[in-house]
Amino acid sequence: MSGFRGLVPELENSLWSSPTTSCMSKMCWWLLWGILHTCPTQASVLLAQQSPQQLTSPGYPEPYLKGQESHTDIEAPEGFAVRLTFQDFDLEPSPDCEGDSVTISTGGTDATRLCGRQGSPLGNPPGHREFVSSGRSLRLTFQAHSSSKSKITHLHKGFLALYQAVAVNQPNGDTEAVTTPGAPKIQNHCQDPYYKADQTGTLSCPSSWKWKDRQDGGEVPECVPVCGRPVVPLAENPNTFGSSRAKLGNFPWQAFTSIYGRGGGALLGDRWILTAAHTIYPKDSIYLRRNQNVEVFLGHTDIDELLKLGNHPVRRVVVHPDYRQHESHNFNGDIALLELEQRVPLGPNLLPVCLPDNETLYHSGLWGYVSGFGVEMGWLTTKLKYSKLPVAPREACEAWLHQRQRTEVFSDNMFCVGEEMQVNSVCQGDSGSVYVVWDDLALRWVATGIVSWGIGCGKGYGFYTKVLSYMDWIKRVIEGKD
């Protein structure tokens, strides 16, 4: 049997010999490591493995019965915690979830009570939240109160959740058992191809019961997101202008934002959104303060589907200190970071973009892509579109502005994209989205620019925030030093 068996000495025997006072029937049965222990009292114990396993409400996906209550305790081995996420959730909503509910107790001070339907404003559905135990165990309580009308509800099917054991301080990693004589040890793995370990090696578990690196005695390696490598890469197109419809997975870092209006952004890591400062503090005298309602949607190319997936609440908004909202002709410092309340689960439709590390990614004539949900031919689009555009010579953009007697600041912290006589399909609603180029050395897509400003929609150049100029600031913010 694979998994954690053999990793925790004596745990196996103690589980098999442990008395179960709540099970008074010979119908009770045990199967170790992740299989349900069922009792007539509807109390159960699940032992988490490193691979995700399913937990559902009784009868799922059929409508659940009214008048039942069940308690499920999920336990992880020493040195691991339990992580639980909901893939589907559909319970009858009620005020404060006093009716049908799922209650999650992670070992902290407060339990979380959930109800309603995923994506609905009614009740308190789990959305994208991850529930991670503070210790080795997590309890899920499912309650379906009796109904005077019928024992069956024909509207609500219950829930489907995934649970797994994760190494402490390593929320996105898996481990593989190595059952050799001596101290237990594991070979660390991350969830390919979306995460990678920041170090490699075999971990051992000495008598202190703390996992250590066998080479240097360090702590469990951290799994970090893999950036700039879409599972569904773009098909190679000729150097033509205009916009095209993106396929699901082409631009998995694309964010759709709703603040003062629609805008864009890009996922960094699994918790940050890179965007333009002017989407938060618009260059308009009527907007004196930042809108408190900042919504972020991720994981799809269709706005209707994005709304169904739900908003990712924002914990913190950080705007670059050089940005001046009241200077309408100066977009210097037009960059901001949004920290999400919860880490997002990465997958084929949701992956981060990489950040630049050298000037060669800004050479004139280098082709890149910009994507967004902005205006197209005068209409708001509901589908993600993208355009292929070249980095333009700086002198050409300066001359173009001078010919039109424009007074906008074109600083060294900006660059321009496009060609003077060709169509520039970037327009209102694309602000905050990123311009990406392919890094031939690192073999990944890099966000070199942020859609910042332009002169109308149509022909001509677009002007972008140069991300490389702000890399030190980005690192300080993400590391909590700014």
UniProtKB/Swiss-Prot annotation:
InterPro entries: CUB_dom, Peptidase_S1_PA, Peptidase_S1_PA_chymotrypsin, Peptidase_S1A, Sperma_CUB_dom_sf, Trypsin_dom, TRYPSIN_SER. The keyword Transferase does not apply. Residues 44-166 form the CUB domain. Disulfide bonds join 97-115, 190-223, 397-416, 427-457. Its EC number is 3.4.21.-. Gene3D superfamilies: Complement Module, domain 1, Spermadhesin, CUB domain, Trypsin-like serine proteases. It is found in: Secreted. One of its GO terms (biological process) is innate immune response. Residues 1-43 form the signal peptide. Residues 166-225 form the Sushi domain. Mediates the proteolytic cleavage of HP/haptoglobin in the endoplasmic reticulum. This is Complement C1r subcomponent-like protein. It comes from Mus musculus (Mouse). The lineage of its organism: Eukaryota, Metazoa, Chordata, Craniata, Vertebrata. The gene is C1rl.
